[in-house]
Amino acid sequence: MEPSLLMWRFFVFIVVPGCVTEACHDDPPSLRNAMFKVFRYEVGTMINCDCKTGFRRVSAVMRCVGDSSHSAWENRCFCNSTSPAKNQVKQVTPAPEEHREKKHTDAQNQTQPPEEADLPGHCEEPPPWEHEREPLKRVYHFTLGQTVHYQCAQGFRALQTSPAESTCMMINGELRWTRPRLKCIREGEHGQASDDAEPQESTEAPPGSGTFLPTRMAGTTNFQKPTDEIATLDTFIFTTEYQIAVAGCTLLLASILLLSCLTWQRKWKKNRRTI
């Protein structure tokens, strides 16, 4: 085998798998009169670093990284003002004590590690960052193995008492969310619980439908009241950087295949001339 072909195949083996991510491209199932929570995030989960109008993000996304022994959020989100005037520091000489305190605070902010999870291998809900666009409407990119927990919206109750959850799994070669078994009826109504009750698809937008409740209580099954802070999960939208990365990986793979074909063709012609 020619050295060039061997090098390209080694390059494909090393680089191309890194371009493939086990991301759940669809949102978790939406149930009528129900909402879901996420207690902890799988390693690989990403959050869009969205900023308010007049500010731009430093990093495109914040990612949960780590392994079974340690996990944390990488690339914390920061928003810088797009106005030069706001970025200018006023030329005011601070008092010595204020200067030392400010210097210590700045150094601490720069060296402070990302938020760590209580449970290794997972990350908790990160705190809001300064100038975040809408903390209650963050855009999450879930990964394989992520589980979300469902509960009925305020004013509704579940017919069954068993936990209702959905997990992103590999099903028939595709990443899909499992169907949660939950049926919610209005409080005061009488209904018969059934283990075979199928989840109802949401055909309208009733109160609490399709909402997202982040929580920092990892590993617990006690739901907060629906009146707590909630966040609507926006439609999954790839960031521009992610689209560019996917396009680059596709172009790279096509180029490698083309070069491999050309190398094989040249080798074949060379062998034919020798014969």
UniProtKB/Swiss-Prot annotation:
It is a single-pass type I membrane protein. Receptor for interleukin-2. The receptor is involved in the regulation of immune tolerance by controlling regulatory T cells (TREGs) activity. TREGs suppress the activation and expansion of autoreactive T-cells. Residues 96-106, 119-130 have a biased composition (Basic and acidic residues). This is Interleukin-2 receptor subunit alpha. CDD domains: CCP. It is found in: Membrane. The keyword Kinase does not apply. GO terms for biological process: immune system process; inflammatory response. It comes from the Eukaryota. Residues 1-21 form the signal peptide. It holds the Pfam family Sushi. Glycans are attached at residues 80, 109. GO terms for molecular function: interleukin-2 binding; interleukin-2 receptor activity. Disulfide bonds join 24-64, 49-77, 51-79, 123-168, 152-184. Residues 88-130, 188-221 are annotated as: Disordered. Residues 22-243 are extracellular. The lineage of its organism: Eukaryota, Metazoa, Chordata, Craniata, Vertebrata. Residues 263-275 are cytoplasmic. The keyword Transmembrane helix applies. PANTHER family: INTERLEUKIN-2 RECEPTOR ALPHA CHAIN, INTERLEUKIN-2 RECEPTOR SUBUNIT ALPHA. It comes from Bos taurus.
